[in-house]
């Protein structure tokens, strides 16, 4: 059963995400629902207008977000310690705004995603009301989707951002967070945050 869950939750979503890579490399206008304050520490992120601890226990997920009910239904046999699944994170209109990895960090088998922790978030753009928008997704000091290479270098001076490449991928560390920034024309169009 666990083997089947692994194929369904991990391999299939990863395959589907790979098909989207070429179509996502576009700079869209930022969606208006944005977090208004500045994050000053390295253990929080903000997605849309919601500030969240990261890594984030699923039980603390803001009411503005949810995952499909089937992930709860499919876990009745349990997920072992250390195992994980990946899925879309939906807003209150059931629109996918991010993609997450949910991990069982307990030492025992759990039967509900609410007993697990979000250890990875990646976001780029989403469609709402027939328009495509960049997802407001930021870490400390306002760095996130829509940030320029120059803004990133001010906060992460060691970031190795190529000067003349139209597309680049840069990894930086921020406390317990590992950040992957994908640039198009030296602007962040996609960001992933994972925990060690």
Kindly give the residue locations of the regions a language model identified.
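Short helix/turn-capping signatures at newly exposed starts of structured segments
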Residues: 11-162, 174-176, 184-196
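Extracytosolic low-complexity repeat regions of secreted or lipid-anchored proteins
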Residues: 166-174
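Hydrophobic membrane-insertion alpha-helices, especially the h-region
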Residues: 1-10
């Amino acid at each position: 059963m666990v083997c089947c869950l692994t194929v369904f939750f991990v391999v299939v979503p990863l395959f589907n995400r790979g098909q989207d890579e070429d179509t996502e490399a576009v700079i869209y206008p930022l969606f208006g629902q944005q977090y208004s304050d500045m994050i000053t520490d390295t253990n929080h992120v903000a997605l849309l207008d919601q500030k969240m601890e990261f890594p984030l226990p699923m039980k603390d997920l803001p009411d503005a977000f949810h995952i499909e009910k089937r992930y709860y239904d499919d876990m009745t046999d349990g997920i072992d310690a250390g195992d994980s699944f990946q899925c879309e994170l939906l807003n209150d209109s059931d629109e996918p705004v991010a993609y997450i990895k949910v991990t069982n960090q307990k030492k025992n088998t759990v039967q509900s995603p609410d007993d697990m922790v979000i250890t990875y978030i990646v976001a780029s753009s989403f469609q709402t009301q027939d328009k495509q928008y960049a997802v407001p997704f930021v870490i400390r000091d306002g760095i996130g989707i829509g940030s320029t290479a120059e803004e990133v270098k001010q906060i992460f001076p060691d970031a190795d951002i190529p000067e003349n490449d139209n597309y680049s991928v840069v990894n930086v560390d921020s406390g317990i967070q590992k950040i992957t920034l994908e640039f198009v024309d030296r602007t962040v169009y996609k960001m992933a945050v994972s925990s060690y």
